[in-house]
């Protein structure tokens, strides 16, 4: 490159610098004008003041948030450290447990001791079964057999008593009562015949009068006899008792066990003597 070329280049550079300087001067003038305008404009000042207050508030809030974040970070770090310590302790305990599990000699000893206890308990149970339980069961069976035999003997005795009383004594007593009633009827008939024979030979008027008297007396005597026979069934009947139609005896109630002595049930008793047959004293009403 020649000197002329250098000179032209420098001239161009100077011209460019001059243009830049002029542009900078123009920009400086415009910037100064803008600054002056902003300084003189109160609205821009208020906006700047509000913006500065907002920036200050934000800075305070940001500082508070940063402090809170630092506190939370510290707490989280402490929790992490505690968790890490717990995991370390668990790892140590787990390793110890694993080592203990690998060593099964103690378990074998415990199992063998348990087997020995089972053998001892089995031996004791077998001894108890042979020496105490089996004899006790045998004695219990013997007592049960003796009790059953005693019950059987008592039942047979009761059956014999029932047979003697309800099948022998009661029918005999009923027959005696029927014979006594028949004798009483015969006596009443004989007395009436005697009265007719005694008053039958007088004159007509006297005979008529005597016959009327005899008839009246006979009626009275017959009525007395009838009343005497009917008295046990009506007037002398206890108010709190009821008569059995089979044996004609009086009881507080006609029950199934009593009817079984006559080989009869309550249904059969009602079929025989009617559905309204009294079974209790209150049934008369």
UniProtKB/Swiss-Prot annotation:
Keywords: Gas vesicle, Plasmid, Repeat. Its main location: other. Sequence repeats lie at residues 22-52, 53-84, 85-122, 123-155, 156-188, 189-220. The keyword Repeat applies. Induction: In PHH4 (a deletion of the p-vac locus) not transcribed in exponential phase, transcribed from stationary to mid-stationary phase. Small amounts of longer transcripts that probably include gvpC-gvpN-gvpO and further downstream are also seen. Gas vesicles appear earlier when grown in static culture, possibly due to O(2)-limitation. It comes from the Archaea. InterPro entries: Gas-vesicle_GvpC_halobac. GO terms for biological process: gas vesicle organization. One of its GO terms (cellular component) is gas vesicle. It holds the Pfam family Halo_GVPC. Residues 22-220 are annotated as: 6 X approximate tandem repeats. It is found in: Gas vesicle. Belongs to the halobacterial gas vesicle GvpC family. Confers stability, involved in shaping gas vesicles (GV), hollow, gas filled proteinaceous nanostructures. GVs allow positioning of halobacteria at an optimal depth for growth in the poorly aerated, shallow brine pools of their habitat. Expression of 2 c-vac DNA fragments containing 2 divergently transcribed regions (gvpE-gvpF-gvpG-gvpH-gvpI-gvpJ-gvpK-gvpL-gvpM and gvpA-gvpC-gvpN-gvpO) allows H.volcanii to produce gas vesicles. Encoded in a 14-gene locus called c-vac which produces cylindrical gas vesicles only in the stationary growth phase. This is Gas vesicle protein C2. It comes from Halobacterium salinarum (strain ATCC 700922 / JCM 11081 / NRC-1) (Halobacterium halobium).
